[in-house]
Regions:
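Conserved Nudix-box catalytic region and its N-terminal flanking loop in Nudix hydrolases
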Residues: 59-100, 157
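Active-site segment of metal-dependent pyrophosphate-handling enzymes
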Residues: 99-140
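Acidic, metal-coordinating catalytic segment for phosphate/diphosphate chemistry
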Residues: 15-50
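Predominantly extracellular/luminal regions of secreted and cell-surface proteins
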Residues: 1-27, 98
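Histidine-centered active-site/metal-ligand motif
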Residues: 46, 66, 78, 115, ...
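NUDIX/MutT-family hydrolases
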Residues: 142-173
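Short, well-ordered beta-strand micro-motif
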Residues: 53, 133-135, 153-155
Length: 181
């Protein structure tokens, strides 16, 4: 199966928990009528994947301070030719940006978000992001990559750090509901 086919299947099978995300799902599926929708070269907007990295043992989440947008965000980014699924994209990005090996994804996407970004090579573009939750192994140690200004653990039960955005707050709420207390 190709990444494009997986994206169509994943989004077709996903039920948006809100009317806003149901509308986003339809927008993503419309974008996927163009086979280049998983490529960063598509200026009209392209699919990306992200993962909120959580440590369920210490009830904490790992966020990065994004170099370009200056917000605390989950790990995530563009699809690469070697990726076979959206889950692969999310897991690869989470591993690269957190430095944590042996992450595992909870099943299925947990949120969708559409956001404008300064994106190479197209200049300003739109990311059609599919978000997952990645779980750390016990005793995981993070490592800052050169893509971020900072990398920090925050309480999963506290408020999301500032500055961030509503999509991150929604993702954190969903992660809380998926993890055992």
């Amino acid at each position: 199966m190709t990444l494009h086919a997986d994206a169509v299947r994943t989004l077709s099978d996903w039920t948006g928990p809100t009317s806003h995300e149901s509308a986003l799902r339809e927008e993503y599926l419309a974008a996927l009528r163009d086979v280049s929708a998983t490529s960063r070269t598509r200026a009209a907007g392209h699919l990306t994947a992200s993962a909120l990295v959580v440590d369920p043992y210490q009830r904490r989440m790992l966020l990065l301070l994004h170099r370009l947008v200056g917000l605390w965000l989950p790990m995530g980014g563009h699809c690469e030719p070697s990726d076979r699924t959206l889950a692969d994209v999310a897991l690869r990005e989470a591993t690269e940006e957190s430095g944590i090996a042996s992450l595992s994804l909870l099943p299925g996407p947990v949120a969708l978000d559409r956001h404008p970004v300064p994106c190479r090579p197209t200049g300003n573009s739109v990311h059609l992001d599919v978000a997952y939750v990645a779980v750390t192994p016990p005793g995981a140690v993070e490592s800052l990559s050169d893509e971020s200004l900072d990398l920090q653990w925050f309480s999963l039960d506290g408020v999301a750090p500032e500055p961030t955005d509503d999509a991150v707050r929604r993702l954190v709420e969903r992660a809380r509901m998926l993890l055992p207390v």
